[in-house]
Amino acid sequence: MGQKTNPNGLRLGIIRTWDSQWCVNDKEIPALIKEDFLIRQLINNFSKRNSISQIEIQRLKEKTKNRITITIHTAKPGIIIGKDGETRNKIQAQLKKLTQKDINLNILEVKNPDKTAVLVAQNMAEQLENRMKFRRVQKMAIQKAFKAGAKGIKVLISGRLNGDEIARSERHDEGRVPLHTLRADIDYAALEAHTTYGVLGIKVWIFHGEVLPGQTILDTRKPFVSQNKFIKRPRYFKGGKNNHVDAKEN
């Protein structure tokens, strides 16, 4: 059933944790679920497709019930912060008005946007809405993900591709994407692209590696550093090819 389930939800409590973390009574849970939904909706609607990959909400301390800690993970922190923090202050003020509580707003930069499933799907949706060919969009997303250090990626686009009257699905994948392995760190996202021919569905699976005992997801998602050594070619002088500088390794 690994092929049919959401990989993020399937791994909760195993290698992943929840985006909302509370320390409350059972009677308060329904109201807080609705409040968290409205908080995320407000942040995402404030400026659509501003490269937000994750929104974490924490209410962990009993003494600070009237304070909510919100952490926004984004590839473009400058857009969220704004000039002199103007945009950040607006978001914080609207959240305070919505929840009637003190808001501690943190903004963290995503170091690897090319291998973060939500950001990859957002970029693909934007390109499809700009009428770029879907196969080119798929290939570009896969190439960038592998260049960023991903070990496997699968991309699925469904709908009226290229304006065809009959909807269909096109899948392209590279590398390993072990959906049945619960210790496999698989990032998943599903979004929609609104084109002139209708709505296209986009799904992205990215495999970062296996989380071994004693490790966390942060260990498998470290920024990729290339280990390749580049060798300079010989540089020749005008006197002839016999007079040259030996190649040196960096």
From Swiss-Prot:
It comes from the Bacteria. The keyword Ribonucleoprotein applies. GO terms for cellular component: cytosolic small ribosomal subunit. GO terms for biological process: translation. Residues 39-111 form the KH type-2 domain. Transmembrane segments: none annotated. Keywords: Ribonucleoprotein, Ribosomal protein, RNA-binding, rRNA-binding. CDD domains: KH-II_30S_S3. It holds the Pfam family Ribosomal_S3_C. Part of the 30S ribosomal subunit. Forms a tight complex with proteins S10 and S14. Binds the lower part of the 30S subunit head. Binds mRNA in the 70S ribosome, positioning it for translation. Belongs to the universal ribosomal protein uS3 family. This is Small ribosomal subunit protein uS3. It comes from Phytoplasma australiense. The lineage of its organism: Bacteria, Bacillati, Mycoplasmatota, Mollicutes, Acholeplasmatales.
